[in-house]
């Protein structure tokens, strides 16, 4: 006789299986022009081991490359390049500043972007920027974009600005102003932040979303919701509305990239605690971060390759 616990577990697994099936089917009605490629990147966020262990695990899981913070320390730079070369991985870099003073912040940002872009070891697929701050003025934040446009034109590297809380593009209507005034602004699309900031799945901002989706060159594939930047497990049926919304946005980006024949990069970016919800007192994570990111890797590969 099946116990109630067993029944609930069987029901949950069956429902989850249906959700997985829906998103592992290839994207339809999306003609592919020559030149389209999908590159899926691994995050080192929350990884407990060494650089070599991280790169080895990413390669074994099927990732094409890694996304990692650019370091201003030469020894760390060499360690990163040695590890990706050893394991045959592509690379994308993260760059940012941290100071509360806009001029000092911009100086650090420029040093990081310039170092990542002009390194002589391995050309990055892209540079993703946590640009400016939400409390800097428009002109102060625009200086970050102006610098990256110049570096991108000089090097041919895609330099992108992430839709991220606390940064210049922290909310959809704020980002809309930048997009309206800077026609060649290119984005890393982490829409989970906008969902959290607006406390919605953005159904009331279709025009802004449509404009943003045309600017996306890189996706951070984490699923947020109305009350937070990360669901505890995207395979859980209670998150179906958020999952549906995020895949609809990502589908639109991929259709455009396929149509024009461009490389598309995606980072699977479910994070560790405190992004990952935990149990009280023990702080035990509610799900396995690495397993969720590999699930996202496999799902995205089947859908968008």
Please give the residue ranges for each predicted region.
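Histidine-acidic metal/acid-base catalytic patches
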Residues: 12, 19-22, 31-33, 52, ...
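Active-site beta-loop-alpha junctions enriched in small/polar residues
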Residues: 41-46, 69-71, 96-100, 132-134, ...
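Conserved strand-to-helix beginnings and helix N-cap segments that scaffold or border functional pockets
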Residues: 51-52, 77-78, 106, 141-142, ...
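Active-site acidic/histidine proton-transfer and metal-coordination neighborhood
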Residues: 12-13, 20, 101-186
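Surface-exposed, active-site-proximal loop segments in enzymatic domains
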Residues: 97-111, 135-137, 144, 230-240, ...
């Amino acid at each position: 006789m099946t116990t109630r616990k067993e029944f609930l577990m069987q029901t949950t697994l069956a429902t989850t299986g249906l959700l997985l099936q829906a998103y592992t089917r290839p994207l339809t009605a999306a003609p592919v022009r020559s030149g389209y490629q999908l590159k899926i990147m691994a995050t080192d966020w929350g990884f407990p081991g060494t650089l070599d262990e991280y790169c080895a695990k990413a390669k074994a899981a099927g990732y094409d490359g890694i996304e990692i913070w650019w370091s201003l320390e030469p020894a760390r730079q060499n360690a990163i390049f040695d590890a990706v070369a050893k394991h045959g991985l592509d690379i994308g870099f993260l760059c940012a500043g941290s100071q509360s003073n806009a001029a000092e912040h911009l100086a650090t940002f420029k040093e990081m972007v310039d170092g990542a872009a002009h390194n002589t070891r391995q050309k990055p697929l892209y540079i993703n920027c946590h640009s400016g701050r939400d409390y800097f003025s428009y002109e102060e934040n625009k200086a970050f974009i102006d610098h990256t446009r110049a570096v991108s034109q000089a090097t041919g590297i895609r330099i992108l600005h992430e839709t991220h809380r606390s940064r210049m593009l922290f909310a959809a209507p704020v980002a809309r102003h930048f997009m309206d005034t800077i026609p060649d602004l290119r984005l890393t699309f982490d829409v989970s932040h906008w969902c959290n900031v607006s406390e919605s799945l953005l159904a009331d901002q279709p025009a802004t979303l449509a404009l943003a989706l045309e600017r996306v060159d890189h996706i951070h594939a984490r699923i947020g919701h109305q009350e937070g930047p990360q669901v505890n497990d995207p395979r859980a049926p209670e998150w179906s509305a958020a999952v549906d919304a995020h895949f609809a946005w990502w589908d639109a980006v991929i259709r455009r990239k396929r149509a024009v024949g461009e490389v598309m990069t995606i980072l699977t970016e479910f994070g560790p605690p405190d992004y990952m919800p935990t149990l009280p007192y023990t702080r035990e994570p509610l799900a396995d971060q690495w397993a969720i990111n590999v699930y996202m890797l496999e799902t995205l590969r089947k859908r968008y390759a």
